[in-house]
């Protein structure tokens, strides 16, 4: 029997899109709590966030695979943060042409055209670290086994050792 296949790019894009969407909602809820002491935690985002995050993280995945043996994690996270600013500015500028940009940072002190702001540099850097270490690395480890029965574990051919899948 053939070994399980890695997830397709579309499947990984989907997971990255959902992850980004969720993080956006959680960040806006936390931000509103810190700024306005709003105990309701009303996290919000736009459906555009699915495309924006899914595509961006898939591109960062390619960067990770290229850079992981070439530079340390701090440099990689700096590169990912710069990419995030470029991507956020570009997608925001395109969406603004259709009056569809869901964010406006013009009230921030260090914004550029209301599309990006330096106040988010540290959160973006930290998010880059989490994205690489938890999301991308683990997503790349996921496998699709088309022969598995729905709901049944495959422990007869695979065992767990120290959190890693090990073929018998």
From Swiss-Prot:
The chain crosses the membrane at residues 15-35, 41-61, 73-93, 110-130. Coiled coil: none annotated. It holds the Pfam family ABC_trans_CmpB. One of its GO terms (cellular component) is membrane. InterPro entries: CmpB_TMEM229. Residues 1-14, 62-72, 131-168 are cytoplasmic. It is found in: Membrane. Keywords: Membrane, Transmembrane, Transmembrane helix. Residues 36-40, 94-109 are extracellular. It is a multi-pass membrane protein. Belongs to the TMEM229 family. PANTHER family: TRANSMEMBRANE PROTEIN 229 FAMILY MEMBER, TRANSMEMBRANE PROTEIN 229B. This is Transmembrane protein 229b. The gene is tmem229b.
């Amino acid at each position: 029997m053939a070994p399980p296949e890695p997830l397709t790019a579309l499947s990984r894009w989907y997971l990255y899109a959902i992850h980004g969407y969720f993080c956006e909602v959680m960040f806006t809820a936390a931000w509103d709590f810190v700024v306005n002491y709003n105990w309701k935690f009303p996290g919000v985002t736009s459906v555009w966030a699915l495309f924006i995050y899914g595509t961006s993280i898939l591109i960062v995945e390619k960067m990770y695979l290229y850079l992981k043996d070439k530079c340390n994690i701090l440099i990689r996270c700096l590169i990912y943060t710069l990419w995030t600013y470029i991507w956020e500015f570009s997608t925001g500028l395109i969406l603004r042409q259709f009056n569809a940009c869901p964010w406006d940072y013009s009230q921030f002190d260090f914004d550029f055209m209301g599309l990006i702001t330096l106040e988010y540099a540290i959160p973006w850097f930290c998010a880059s670290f989490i994205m690489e270490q938890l999301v991308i690395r683990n997503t790349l480890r996921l496998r699709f086994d088309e022969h598995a029965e729905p709901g049944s574990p495959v422990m007869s051919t695979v065992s767990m050792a120290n959190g890693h899948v090990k073929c018998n």
